Amino acid sequence: ALDVHVLGGTKPRPTPLLKDGSETPMRRINFSPEPGIRLTANETLGKAPRKKGKVILLSLDGEVKTAENKLAMVLHQTGRTVLTLSLRATGTHAYAHDKIRRAPDHNTAEWSLWLGQPLIGQWVRDVRTLLDALEKNTDPITIIGDGPAGVVALCAGALDKRIAHTVTTGSLASYISDVPYTGQRLGLMAPKVLLEAGDIPHLAALIAPRRLTIAGAVHGSGKTLTEAELKANFKFTRRFYIGDSFTANPVGDAKAILRILK
C-alpha cells in the first residue's frame, strides 16, 4: 500500500545509467531516475583506514557539502565513504518560484499531486535509483535523512532492503498536528498516507528487522520532542525491533550519531 497506493510507485524505472566518474577519493555518479531527469551524487571515499559501507546523506535544502557539514566531515574523517546529492526539485534542481507562505516547495508539490506521484514518492525513487547505480558495490548502505528529509529516508528504508541502517535527525515525529506546520515540506504530504500506510511511527516499523535510529524529532510546530515524548511517540515502533536494532535518542548531533554508527 505504501509504495503504489500512497507514494505513486517508487520502483526504479529501466532507464540507462549514465557514465560514472573514475574511482578516485572523490567521484561523481550520474544517474537518471526516469526519462528527462538527470541527477548527480558526489561520493567521497573515507579516510584511511577506511571502514566498510557507504553513508548517503539527504537534505531537502539541497546537497550536503562534505567539507561544510559537521556530520559529513566527521563520517569522512572516521573512514566512512559519504554520498551526497540534490534530490529533484531541491537544491540546484529547485524551481525558482516555488515558495508560497510556509511551504518552500508549494508549487512543485502541488504539481506532483496532479500527476498522481507525490513528491515524496519521487524523492524515494531518486534514492532507490542511486542504489541501483551503486549495486556493483555490495557494501552495506546507511541512509541519514536530516530534518524533513528524514521522512524520505524512512520511506526509502521501508521499501528497499538494500538499506541496512536508516537514521533520521530532527525529523517529523507525526503527521498529525493541531497547529500549522513549521519548517516542513509540502512535498512530504501524500494523499491517504494516514489511512492506507499509517503515521510516522507506523512507517518506521516497516523497516524492521533492519536497523533504525531516530536521533531527535520534532512536532509539526517545529518544537523538539523531549526524551519522554520521543519514547512515547515511538512506543508502537519499538515493538517490532529486537535489542538495539532500534534506537530513539533525543540528541541528534554528529557525536551522538557517530556513537550509534560504531
Identify the residue ranges that each predicted region occupies.
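N-terminal cap/lid segment of alpha/beta-hydrolase-fold proteins
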Residues: 6-48
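Catalytic cores of nucleotide-enabled group-transfer and carboxylate-activating enzymes in metabolic
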Residues: 18-24, 28-31, 36, 72-78, ...
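Cap/lid segment of the alpha/beta-hydrolase catalytic domain
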Residues: 50-140, 173-187
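Alpha/beta-hydrolase-fold catalytic nucleophile elbow
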Residues: 86, 169-170, 215
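Primarily recognizes the serine-hydrolase "nucleophile elbow" in alpha/beta-hydrolase
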Residues: 130-206
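Short, flexible/disordered intra-domain loops and linkers
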Residues: 184-185, 221-230
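Conserved strand-to-loop "acid loop" that flanks and positions the catalytic carboxylate
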Residues: 211-220
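C-terminal catalytic histidine-bearing segment of alpha/beta-hydrolase fold enzymes
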Residues: 219-220, 232-262
